[in-house]
A protein has these predicted regions:
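Short amphipathic alpha-helix that is part of the acyltransferase structural core
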Residues: 1-26
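C-terminal "cap" of GNAT-fold acetyltransferases
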Residues: 118-119, 123-138
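Conserved acyl-CoA
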Residues: 87-103
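A conserved beta-turn-beta hairpin within the catalytic core of GNAT-like acetyltransferases
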Residues: 63-74, 130
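A conserved beta-strand-loop-helix scaffold within acyl/acetyltransferase catalytic domains
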Residues: 17-43, 49, 57-67
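A short, internal acetyl-CoA/4′-phosphopantetheine-binding micro-motif in the GNAT/acyltransferase core
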Residues: 73-84
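Conserved beta-strand-loop-alpha-helix junction that forms the acyl-donor binding cleft
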Residues: 105-118, 137-138
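A structural microfeature
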Residues: 53-55, 131
Length: 138
């Protein structure tokens, strides 16, 4: 897990969300319960040749009352290696299909230098642009 912290630091400092930073300790504590990990939070990571993890992708089972559907919703996707990151996504999608999710939601952060490239990647995979979020400090 500590290897992944390096990815959080890079994302938070240079490419992260506007005004907000990933809180790695809170994320770990929030999803440490075994019941949540079995039913509602799904995580895959890539172990690089050097013995360190260089990528992570996680999804939540969004039991969305607004749409009346369970949606396989991206929680976080961080990767130093785009090839490994793509394999993580492929593994996650295969899992979602096996579990009979009907929908998947992926996101991209506007501040990320590859945001446009990621959006084109999603569109090539058949994803449709759906909504845009705005954030402000109160």
């Amino acid at each position: 897990v500590s290897d992944i912290f390096e990815l959080f630091d890079l994302e938070n400092e240079k490419m992260g969300h506007a005004l907000l930073k990933h809180n790695k300790e809170y994320i770990i504590n929030a999803f440490a319960d075994k019941a949540i990990l079995v039913w509602d939070f799904f995580v895959w990571a890539n172990l690089a040749e050097n013995g360190k993890y260089d990528g992570i992708i996680a999804f939540v089972n969004d039991k969305n009352e607004k749409f009346g559907e369970q949606i396989f919703s991206e929680y976080i996707w961080l990767s130093k290696n785009s090839r490994a990151g793509g394999k993580l996504l492929g593994t996650a999608i295969k899992f979602a299909r096996k579990k009979e999710f009907k929908y998947i939601i992926m996101n991209t952060v506007v501040n990320h230098p590859k945001s446009d490239k990621i959006a084109r990647f999603y569109e090539k995979m058949g994803f449709l642009r759906d909504s845009i979020s705005y954030v402000a400090k109160l």
